[in-house]
Amino acid sequence: MTNVELTPEELVSYYIKMTKETMPQLAPTTHKNWPVRNDHCFQRIILDTLCGGIWYDHLPRPAYKHLSREQALQAVNLCNDIIAGTVDLVALNRQSL
């Protein structure tokens, strides 16, 4: 099954798992160059990047409940790209702060 075939709920669930579990687990081990370690920091960076600014100026809280299918898909893809090293998390974090 590809990301394109997933429902909005499945995409959001995958995004939450990646930012709450996968990325925080990778940060102190194989991705020590990442500037953040905590789940809420990964979520802030991903959401700010998707929204093109401070996420809470664009989405009601909690953000994950208000993501469109397209936004959830973009969030999952961005997480995957960050993990793969094809997107610079350091630069995204700077833009987000």
Regions found by a protein language model. Give the residues of each.
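Positively charged, phosphate-engaging catalytic surfaces used for nucleic-acid and nucleotide handling
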Residues: 1-97
